[in-house]
Amino acid sequence: MNHLDRLERKIGYRFNDIALLKQALTHRSAATQHNERLEFLGDSILNFTIAEALYHQFPRCNEGELSRMRATLVREPTLAILARQFELGDYMSLGSGELKNGGFRRESILADCVEAIIGAMSLDQGLAVTTQVIRNWYQQLLAEIKPGDNQKDAKTRLQEYLQGKHLPLPTYEVVNIQGEAHCQIFTVKCKVKSAEKIDRTFVAKGSSRRKAEQAAAEQILKELDIK
């Protein structure tokens, strides 16, 4: 049994075209044939699958409640938890710089890899099979999630924290866009004023402006120890 056989057992899916899995595991720092296009595809499929599951699971919840629960289930820390369960860091291909910087442990890289695997599965065996695999991954998380105030994305939590401290709201600015139109990487700069009235700047990347802004907000919440 080779190392990718072991990974397939962990994720509960057997690829017909193993090259798709290899590409999904390849970070842009390692090769030109990397996983960002697959990540783009997987992000959309994941959001749809979780949205549909929540729609049927919570027939009395409104759009806002469903959106907040979905945001919790598809956000970077949740995907990174799944990645660690699969031990994806042991299978990823990273460039030497990312390896030295511990990229195989970085939440953003792990989360992106999960989405890329989803994209790869959809190309390998189609949407129906892929959505069932995702539901298997999320079985416990879906069983545990409940509508409520704790289901808020990073940007919302950061905004509410700053408002509670009577501090200015964060500002988000796209400072760079790389790649072709169908496969872009957005770099976002977020500025906040801390409780000590000190200006702080955080930079994050994502495959969409929304994901980059959420990643920056998550970074701030961790750095400033905001629960």
UniProtKB/Swiss-Prot annotation:
GO cellular component, one term: cytosol
Domain DRBM: 153-226
Compartments it resides in: Cytoplasm
Pfam short name (any one): Ribonucleas_3_3
InterPro entries documented for this protein: dsRBD_dom (IPR014720), RNase_III (IPR011907), RNase_III_dom (IPR000999), RNase_III_sf (IPR036389)
GO molecular function terms attached to this record: double-stranded RNA binding; metal ion binding; ribonuclease III activity; rRNA binding
Biological process per Gene Ontology, one example term: tRNA processing
Domain of life the protein comes from: Bacteria
Record field: catalytic activity: Endonucleolytic cleavage to 5'-phosphomonoester
Binding of Mg(2+), residues: 39, 112, 115
Subunit structure: Homodimer.
Family as reported in the entry's similarity comment: Belongs to the ribonuclease III family.
HAMAP family reported in the protein's UniProt record: RNase_III
Name the UniProt record assigns to this protein: Ribonuclease 3
Source organism: Haemophilus influenzae (strain ATCC 51907 / DSM 11121 / KW20 / Rd)
